[in-house]
Amino acid sequence: IGDWLRAQGVSSAIVLSSIWCRCQRTAEELKYGPVQIEPALASFFDEPLKAKKLNQQLQQRIANALPNKKNQALILVTHHVNIREFVGKDIGSGDMILAQVNAKGQMISFRHYPSP
């Protein structure tokens, strides 16, 4: 996935990951540098009542990152339940979402990319 992202022009990125080890491994394998663990990206599959709260925390984290990211991509590695809560769509394992967000970190529009 990291090679594919580079081929698309993503040369520099801030990478945030769920604490879950499979997400961390994926994030590290992108090879964009240190991975930051973000609690708002943790799966709530077994605790669906946490969905709204974690999504709000994620939006705040994105909003906080926007002013400082400069020309870097902001890559989030997380779980299908989190993605569904954020964009309202189920996607497959390894698929990617390119999301346009507003200054509050709220999704405006998105494009779905199947796993390369």
Predicted regions and their residues:
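Active-site-proximal alpha-helix that buttresses catalytic centers in soluble enzyme cores
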Residues: I1-P39, F44-P48, K53, K89-N102, ...
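Beta-strand elements within well-structured catalytic alpha/beta cores of enzymes
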Residues: L16-S17, Q72-T78, N82, A99
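Glycine-rich phosphate-binding loop signature in dinucleotide/nucleotide-binding domains
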Residues: Q8-V10, A65-Q72
